[in-house]
Amino acid sequence: MATKTQLELFTKLTSNDKAIRLSSAAQLIDSLSNEEELKYSLNRLTKGLSSGRESARIGFAVALTELLTRTKDIRATHVLDLLVKHNTASGNLKGQDERDFYFGLLFGLQSIVYSGILTHKESTIEDFQRVVDLLLQLSGKKNWLQDVCFYVIYKLVEQIPEISFSSNAFLAVNKLLQTPAVSKSTEGVGLFLCLTRVPDNVKSEEVAMANWEPAHPLHKSNLVTLSKIMRQADASETGGQNSAWKQKIPMVWKYIFEEYQRKTYSGLAPFHDFWAVVVDEGIFSSTSSLERKFWGFQIMELALDYVSSDNIGDIFSKNFLHCLINHLSDEDRYLYRAAKRVTSKLEKVSKQNPTLVYPIAIHLLGERGSLNFDRVTNTKLVEHILPLADEQGILQLFQLLLSYVKRCPEDIASDTKAVEWRRQWATDTMLSILRSKRSIKQEPWVRELLEIFIAYGYFEVPESEEVIPKFSEGTQNMFRLRLMSALSYLSSSAFQQSQTDHQLGDKNWPYVALNYLLELEKSPKNNLLISMDESVIEIVQKSLSVLHKVTKKIDKKAQHLQQLNAFQLLYSLVLLQVYAGDTDSIDVLEDIDNCYSKVFNKKSKRESTSNEPTAMEILTEVMLSLLSRPSLLLRKLVDMLFTSFSEDMNRESIHLICDVLKAKESVKDSEGMFAGEEVEEDAFGETEMDEDDFEEIDTDEIEEQSDWEMISNQDASDNEELERKLDKVLEDADAKVKDEESSEEELMNDEQMLALDEKLAEVFRERKKASNKEKKKNAQETKQQIVQFKVKVIDLIDNYYKTQPNNGLGFEFLIPLLEMILKTKHKVLEEKGQAVFRNRLSKLKWTEEKPSSKNVLEALKKVHVLCGKKASLGSTGSSISQLLLKLLADTPYLKEGVEVYLKSFLLWIQEPSKSHYNANIFHDFINWGAQQRLKHQQTSTAASSPQKTGHHENEKTNH
C-alpha cells in the first residue's frame, strides 16, 4: 500500500501544470522503498492511463516511463498484462469512454517502448511481437490512431540493434510490409524507410514492400504511386487502405526528408523530381482540396529544416509559390494563417542559415514569384530576409537586383512608368539592405554598392553592356541620389557607433566613393555623363590637389586631425556634387579652398587684411549654403563641420547664423537665402499660410526623401500640353478654312479670325490659371523651405551650447533666438527654440569670452520688452533673465538689473492690457533674491568669525 505522501503525489500527476507533473513523477519514483509500494504504483499507473481527468493520462504516462526506465526488475510481460487488463474497452462503450481506453493503451505502449524495457535481457521475442501486434490492432480501431501507432513502431525499430533477439525482431516488423494494407499506405512507407536504417548485420532478409516494383518507394518510377499515397487518395487508386484526413501531416514526411539527406540508396529519385511529382503536382495542384494544400504548407515548413543551398530552389516550385502568394494576399482566405507560418519559417531559416537567403530571394522575386512579392502578399518577407544574407549572398543579391535594372522584360520595355518603377524598386532594395539593422556591414559589399551607384550614376553605360531599355536621365539621377543616401547613412553616428569593426565605422566613405569615381574617370573606356569646361576643370583639379594634401596630413596623424577629417569629408562630398553636374557646388568649392587656405596656411594668415572675411566667416557661409539644401547627407556634414570648428567660431560667424533667424518667413524676403534656387512670388501677392501647414515637420524625413526622389518632369509635360492644345486649335481652324475657301476669297475672314482668337485666348487663360496655381504651390514650398532651414539653424545653436557651454560668445544667440520665437507664426519653430533654452540654459557657464556687463544689461532690458508682448514666453524669458542676472550679480550694474524687473513689475500691475508678462518671471526673481540674500548672510558670518576668534585669543593671552 502506498504512503500518504505517495497518494498526494499520484493526485499531483493529474495537474495541468507541466512542471508540477514532472516534479511529482520524479518524487514518486524516488519514494518507492519496497516491493509492495512498487507493485501498487505499477498497478495504479497502468490503470490511471485511461483516466479522462485533467492531464492524468500524460502525468501517469511520464511516471510509468520513468518507473520502467529506473527499475530493472520489472518484466515487460507483466507490464503488458496490466496494460491490457486496465485499458481494454469492455461492453458496448462509445464516444469519449471508448477513446479514453484507446489512448490509455497507446500511452502505455509508448511508455514500454520509450523506457527501453524490451532491450533488457529478460524480454523475449514474444513480448516484442505482442507490442507490435497491439499497436497494429490499435491503429485499425480509428483512422486518427494510425499515424501515431506506427510512429511508436518506428521508435521500436530504432531499438532493434540493441535487442538480444534483434534478427527475429527485424523479421517480425518486416513481415508487416508484405500486406498491401500496410505497404500501400503512408505508414508503410515510413516503416520501410525505418527498416532500411537497421544495420546489415541485423537484417536476416532484404527489406521489401509488397506490390512495389522496384521495392523502394522513392525510386523514380514509383513517384506517381507515391504521390497518390502521400496525398491519401482513394484505396481504389493505391491498392491500400483509405485514411481519413488528419490536420497534422503524417510522420513519414520527416523520414522522407531524412532519406534525402542520407542518400544511401543509389536508385533514389532526384529531389527535384520527387518534389515536383509528389508535392507540387500532387498536393499543390490547382485541383487539390484546401485540406491537401494545408498539408502542403506544413510539408514546406518541415522541408526547410532539411534542404541546403544546393536544393532549396527545388521546393520553390510553381504551384507552391502561386498558392502561397494567393493565400497571403487576403486575410480572409482559408489558408492565410497557414501561409503566414511558412513566411515566418522562411524568416527563421534565413536567420539561422544566411547562405540560404540568396536562393530563397531569387525564387521569391523570380518568374515563379513576383518582384512585388511584399506588396502583393501584404508582408515584409523579402524586406526582412535580404539583409540577413552573408557577404557572398549580398554580393549575389546586388548583381541580381542590378540585372533587374539593366534588363526589363519585353512586355514592359515600352512602358516608361513600369520600367522606371522596376529600376527604382531595385535600387531602393539595394539601399535598404545597407540601411537595415539586420545586415552585418562588411567592407566588400558596402564598396560594391557604392561602386554600382557611381558607375551608373556618373558615367555612360559602356556599349559592351546590354541595357534594355537605355537608361533615362531620371534613372541615372536616381543612382546619384541613392549614392548620396548611402553616404548619408554611412556618415551617420548611428552607423559608426554600431560597428565593432572601427576600420569600417571610422572610414570616410564619401572619400572612398570619390576615389573610385576618379579611378573610373582615368579609363578611356569610361565617359562622364557631364562635360566640364576648362575653368571648372581647373577649379576641380585645384580642389583635388588640396584634398590630396589633407589626406597626407591625416595619414601622418598631424595636428588638428578632427578639422582635417572634416575638410576631407567636405571636399569629397562637394566634388561628388560637382561631378553630378551641380553648378552651385563649384562656387562652394572655391569658398572651401579659400577657407582651407586661411585655416591651415600660415602665409595666407600673415597676408590677410582686416577687411577680408576670416576663415570662420567663410566656413560658416559654406555651412549655411549647404544647410539650405534639402539633403540629409549635407545636413549631417554640416553638423560634423560645426562640431569640429565650434571652438573656433568668432563673433562675426555667429552673427551670420543669427541673420538667418532674423530673416522674415515670407517669399519675397527669401531671395538669396537658398543657393541656386529662384523664388517666385505668387501672382496675387505674398501667399499667407496657416501654421498648421508647418506643424509636425519632420526635416529628416523631408531631406531623406530629397535624397531619394527622382527628378520630376512636370514643367516639361506642362509645356508639351500647352503646345498640344495650341496645335489642335490651329489645325481645326486651318481645316475649316480649307473646307470653306474659294479661289477668290481670303485664307481666313474676320469671323473666323475672331473665333480663332477666342479659342487661343481660352487656351492661354487655362494656362495662366494653371500657372497661378503652380506659383502658389511654389510659394508654399518656399515658405516650407524657410521653416526647415531655420529648424536646422536652431539645431546648430543647440549644438554650440552643448559643445561650448563655457564660451561667452553663445550670449550672441540669446536675443535673435528669442525674437524669432516671438515673431514666428509657425509652432514648430517656436517649440524648437524654446526647447533649446529649456535644455541648455542651466548648463551655460560663460567663463571664457565673458560678455560685458553693459551688453548683458541691455540684453536683460530687451528680454523683458519681448516677454511683455507674449505670455507664452514667460518660462523661457524668466530662465534667460536669471542667467543674465547671475552675470550682473557681482557687478555695479546689479542695481540697474533689478530696476529692469521693477519697471516690468509696475507695467504688469498698472497696464495689464499692454503688458503680458507671466507671473513666473517675478516669482523666480524673488526666489533668486532670497538665494542672494542667504549667500551674503553666509559670507558676512564667515568674514566675522575669524575676528571674534582672534579677540578671544588676545584676551586669553592677556590673562
Swiss-Prot record:
Entries under SUPFAM superfamilies matching the protein: ARM repeat
InterPro entries listed in its UniProt record: ARM-type_fold, DNA-dir_DNA_pol_B_CS, DNA_pol_V/MYBBP1A
Organism listed in the record: Schizosaccharomyces pombe (strain 972 / ATCC 24843)
Family: Belongs to the MYBBP1A family.
GO biological process: regulation of DNA-templated transcription; rRNA processing; rRNA transcription
GO cellular component: cytosol; nucleolus; nucleus
Protein name from the UniProt record: rDNA transcriptional regulator pol5
Recorded GO MF terms: nucleotide binding; rDNA binding; RNA polymerase I transcription regulatory region sequence-specific DNA binding
